[in-house]
Amino acid sequence: RLMKNNGVDVSDMPKSPVYVALGGKAVGAVGIDGEVRPEAAETIKKLRKLGVEHSVMLTGDTAEQARKVCSVCDIDDFRSGLLPQDKLSSLEDIKDGSKGVIYVGDGINDAPVLACADVGVAMGLGTQAACEAADVILTDSELSRLADTVYQSKRAMSVLRSNIAFAVIVKVVVVALGVAGLAPMW
């Protein structure tokens, strides 16, 4: 975007490029082609089994790179070429039509989005800003830990709901017995 804003044509440059311009002309680029992590597709599959209905990748990478990752990992949608403020705007749009949004990130550019998400997850002790903005910090960079965390969270919420229901039922029974004169109130 910086190059386009300065009138430099970079339309035929490779992959996720780092550009070099001189005198308003693109003179070079280094293409960065990140590998898709082996556990990424399996993690998305596990998240779907746990009830995640829709997955969206928000990235600063090119559309070509994003499409490749989404294809390999079975991610439903992507938004590419995003600056940090664009990621935040995209997340707000996604939140409008969703029951709940989990955002996973690891960099300083992710901090505002991690804070805005219903649940922000910082991976691998990313940057200090990301860790401070996140609700959950996964201390290693294994993506499979994300699915494990969602599973454990769902289990904990189930136990919590059961405990609350049990406590309310016991209170109602004791109050009813107390009103009937069959149990002391204290």
Across the structure, where does each feature detected by a protein language model lie?
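Cytosolic catalytic headpiece
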Residues: R1-V119, Y151-K154
